[in-house]
Amino acid sequence: MLFQANRHANQSVNQWRLFFQALTLSTLAALFSTNALSQEIKLVSAGAGVTELVLALDAADELVAVDSTSYLPEHLATVAKLGYHRMLSAEGIMALSPTLVVGSEVMGPETTLNVLKQAKIEVVKLPSSAYEKQLMTNIDTLAQLLKRTDKAIQLKQDLHQRLDGLNKQQQQLSQQQTQPKILFMLLQEGRGARVGGKGTAADTIIALAGAKNIADFEGYKSLSQEGILSLQPDVILLSTRSEQSDPQTDEQTAQALLKEMPLLAHTPAGKNGHIQTLAPQALLGGLGISAIGAAEDLAATLLKQDQ
């Protein structure tokens, strides 16, 4: 009798032990599940340069939306597209239930950003980067927000090497007897061609490549064909703002330009076929991945001319 009582008691204890173990495991699982959900990142990226960094940090899976200036590869076609990064809609963003909105320093309007903050959505602006130091700081900030600090180390190393390569190309070009003269033109449907002078994003790219921007005024100005012809540019850089979805090749763009402005065929750039396109993304957000790439392309063109 005593043996049977002890056996029943032991069975009861074991059953309770198994019950508490199962309860503990289920509780831990629920905690881990809740913790995982709380750490889930749903990102809205507003600004071409910011979105480039998100992709470079291998954080595309976190994106729920980007603004209209951002370029996305085809496999991310399902990511929602918002409006212009200066004119964002709070309702459009909140409908996507993001946890984080990151944009350039001109992201806005402030009324929209304030509504998002009141809804407990984290909003972060990254300063425009005119120099390498700020670009690297922006990468670190974004990497911490997206939990990609390991990716940031490699990205910063890669960009530093590319900028170092541009510095070396600048030195090579500085040894030429005459510094190449570059003209940047912005073409926009319904408006005349505008030339980019000092203080523009194009001016930064030209300087990075080690060349001279022959437009000596500040900002953008409209110039006639005769005015451009008098400058005698060695290379013409073109960027377009249009509703056309398919990008044109350098040759197609050059042909379209010379058809519209035939006098430019008499410039050194027109005679030698040195008219090349500049991706619109390279002109947004200051020094970034696209701007560095554009400077590399321009430097390569100029070095080939010198050979």
What are these regions (language model features)?
Residues E91-S97, S224-Q232:
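Short helices/loops that flank or line small-molecule/ion binding pockets
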Residues K42-L96, L100-V106:
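A short, structured surface patch at a secondary-structure boundary
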Residues G47, E105-V106, S128, E218, ...:
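Short secondary-structure boundary segments
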Residues D67, G196-K221:
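His/Asp/Glu-enriched short active-site or ligand-binding loop at hydrolase and phosphoryl-transfer sites
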Residues F3-T24:
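Bacterial N-terminal signal peptides that target proteins for export
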Residues S38-K42, T111-G190, K212-D216, K271-Q307:
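Extracytoplasmic substrate-binding proteins
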